[in-house]
Amino acid sequence: MDQINHTNVKEFFFLELTRSRELEFFLFVVFFAVYVATVLGNALIVVTITCESRLHTPMYFLLRNKSVLDIVFSSITVPKFLVDLLSDRKTISYNDCMAQIFFFHFAGGADIFFLSVMAYDRYLAIAKPLHYVTMMRKEVWVALVVASWVSGGLHSIIQVILMLPFPFCGPNTLDAFYCYVLQVVKLACTDTFALELFMISNNGLVTLLWFLLLLGSYTVILVMLRSHSGEGRNKALSTCTSHMLVVTLHFVPCVYIYCRPFMTLPMDTTISINNTVITPMLNPIIYSLRNQEMKSAMQRLQRRLGPSESRKWG
């Protein structure tokens, strides 16, 4: 029998989204515009919350960190994707692929914990308004933010440690535009059933249960709001529905990707583009357009910067 060559694969190839160069260029223009909008929109939220003292509260501190995370999450895959759209040879080295998997799961895992902390913050604000200031004092929400980043790091370390021992010695083509961990695992030239089962239980079931838990938490909050009245109720209702929409946009693709056997389906690329390219752009739109405080703060910031710009050019 011929001996199997266990030499590690040096690089992976990405399949083309389309064979038309004109369509690839069109997609480049569209996704480049989306990426710029993502960075600028989330950066605007970060600057507004930082410069506007009225927004120096736990909820907006968490939102600012969420915006930073959205920029990071999008930047892990989209710039490489844009370069590949203009390239004839769409490849990524083995080391860069492992790094992309690490940072992708780092940001994705941290995002899940951030959304959970934001739900906890809204629960305390509505269920325990008299104790909210003491229960969500600065030391507490800073610790929660740090814990979210650390948890994301631990999650990504586990993903990469599990994959590193597997040899890649043959097929090296991914039907994706980034190192999609489920497809990378399938390319290993050894039995990956145990790893696939662990990832489905670790990523899939945990993500599904977490999603249902967050939806349940916001449902409880919305029920509590029925006993409130006036402007405060409308403000809290708008905030919670925005959070629920963002949670849904984040978790539904994750549930689709991880709560099933490792196989390639026709919708995978569309779901991945929605998750990595579109959703990070939608988050600042959802949070700003549905939040009157945020819109007012942006207007005040614009007026504050306006006169200085006029003097600069006058």
UniProtKB/Swiss-Prot annotation:
The keyword Cell membrane applies. Glycans are attached at N5. GO terms for molecular function: G protein-coupled receptor activity; olfactory receptor activity. It is a multi-pass membrane protein. GO terms for cellular component: plasma membrane. It comes from the Eukaryota. Keywords: Cell membrane, Disulfide bond, G-protein coupled receptor, Glycoprotein, Membrane, Olfaction, Receptor, Sensory transduction, Transducer, Transmembrane, Transmembrane helix. The chain crosses the membrane at residues 26-49, 58-79, 101-120, 140-158, 196-219, 236-258, 270-289. Disulfide bonds join C97-C189. Residues 1-25, 80-100, 159-195, 259-269 are extracellular. InterPro entries: GPCR_Rhodpsn (IPR000276), GPCR_Rhodpsn_7TM (IPR017452), Olfact_rcpt (IPR000725), Olfactory_Receptors (IPR050427). Its main location: membrane. Residues 50-57, 121-139, 220-235, 290-314 are cytoplasmic. It is found in: Cell membrane. Odorant receptor. Belongs to the G-protein coupled receptor 1 family. This is Olfactory receptor 4D6.
